[in-house]
Design a protein with these regions (language model features):
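HhH-family (HhH-GPD) DNA N-glycosylase catalytic core used in base-excision repair
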Residues: 1-146
């Protein structure tokens, strides 16, 4: 399935996303992004923090989605995805030696890198830092089989 235009994406019913393993909430977010495509396109001329703020005005787009999107699309060096389970644990493991951390601890730990926190996280990930796992990997449910 190719999404060549926002119009094409808007026309896809949510159950079609199930075949791709995309659950309803994410399908709604994709539809929202397609509906506001021209608004999103205008964020390309904004700096990173302003673009993140603009994206978070859209329904279904929170701090995590805005940070990851702008970190990639704008190269925003400080777009830290707060709320991500793995990122906070990667930071805790790599920089403090503790296998688990909280978002607040991550923000405190990365404060010395203000302005470059996304870069630091990406460097840690690329360097192979990964917090230890304590449970079996969660089984992904194929929503198409429901």
């Amino acid at each position: 399935m190719l999404f060549r235009s926002p119009e094409r994406l808007k026309a896809i019913p949510s159950w079609e996303f199930h075949r791709l393993g995309i659950e309803e909430q994410r399908a709604r977010t994709l539809h929202t992004a397609a509906r506001y495509a021209s608004y999103i396109d205008r964020t390309r001329d904004l700096d990173g923090p302003s673009a993140r703020e603009a994206l978070m005005r859209l329904p279904g787009i929170g701090i995590w989605t805005a940070a990851v999107t702008v970190g990639v699309s704008h190269g925003d060096p400080d777009a830290l995805p707060v709320g991500d389970f793995h990122v906070k644990n990667t930071v805790a493991w790599a920089l403090t030696g503790r296998p688990r951390g909280t978002d607040e601890e991550m923000l405190t730990t990365l404060a010395v890198y203000a302005g470059h926190r996304w870069r630091v996280v990406r460097l840690l990930e690329r360097a192979g830092f990964m917090a230890p796992r304590f449970a079996p990997k969660r089984r992904l449910l194929d929503v198409a089989s429901l």
